[in-house]
Swiss-Prot record:
Disulfide bonds: none
UniProt-recorded Gene Ontology molecular function terms: rRNA binding; structural constituent of ribosome; tRNA binding
PANTHER family registered for this protein in UniProt: RIBOSOMAL PROTEIN S7
GO (cellular component) term, any one: small ribosomal subunit
InterPro entries tied to this protein: Ribosomal_uS7, Ribosomal_uS7_bac/org-type, Ribosomal_uS7_CS, Ribosomal_uS7_dom, Ribosomal_uS7_dom_sf
Protein's name according to its UniProt entry: Small ribosomal subunit protein uS7
Family: Belongs to the universal ribosomal protein uS7 family.
Keyword Chloroplast: no
Entry keyword set: Ribonucleoprotein, Ribosomal protein, RNA-binding, rRNA-binding, tRNA-binding
GO BP terms in the entry: translation
Function: One of the primary rRNA binding proteins, it binds directly to 16S rRNA where it nucleates assembly of the head domain of the 30S subunit. Is located at the subunit interface close to the decoding center, probably blocks exit of the E-site tRNA.
């Protein structure tokens, strides 16, 4: 492994419609097989559905949903003397966002609505009201970290 220099974080270009970097990142998380235009259509349709249902600013609903899904702690496996412990660790801010987006998309894909846009809109609305599968996932991760608090001294 070369020891030249640390490669910096790439700047992500804001999305074309709302000029939001957060939304651009979310589009990249939704995207499958490199089909970015399809991912953009899904996101924008979901935001339109949210605007119809809520009447509020749809970007605020997205931000609220992500706030309610972001984990503050997670567990990592650590092998100590032949046994593996689940060690609770704090989550870096960039990873918090990434996990929140990933969990929102995974939860939306498991929902029953007809189109992905409707599923995503439903999950974002649920998450903004502190309910739904993605919020449950965050609570499970926090519960796991709380249960393994005794192993916190194994942090690295």
């Amino acid at each position: 492994m070369p020891r030249r220099r640390v490669v910096g974080q790439r700047k992500i270009l804001p999305d074309p419609k709302f000029h939001s970097e957060l939304l651009a990142k979310f589009i990249n998380v939704i995207m499958q097989d490199g089909k970015k235009s399809t991912a953009e259509k899904i996101i924008y349709k979901a935001l339109d559905v949210i605007a119809e249902k809520k009447g509020a600013n749809h970007l605020d609903v997205l931000e609220a949903a992500l706030d309610n899904v972001r984990p503050s702690v997670e567990v990592k496996s650590r092998r100590v003397g032949g046994s593996t412990y689940q060690v609770p660790c704090e989550v870096r801010p960039v990873r918090r966002n990434a996990l929140a987006m990933r969990w929102l998309v995974e939860a939306a894909r498991k929902r029953g609505e007809k189109s992905m846009a409707l599923r995503l809109a439903g999950e974002m609305l649920d998450a903004s009201e502190n309910k739904g599968t993605a919020v449950k996932k965050r609570e499970d991760v926090h519960r796991m970290a709380e249960a393994n608090k005794a192993f916190a001294h194994y942090r690295w």
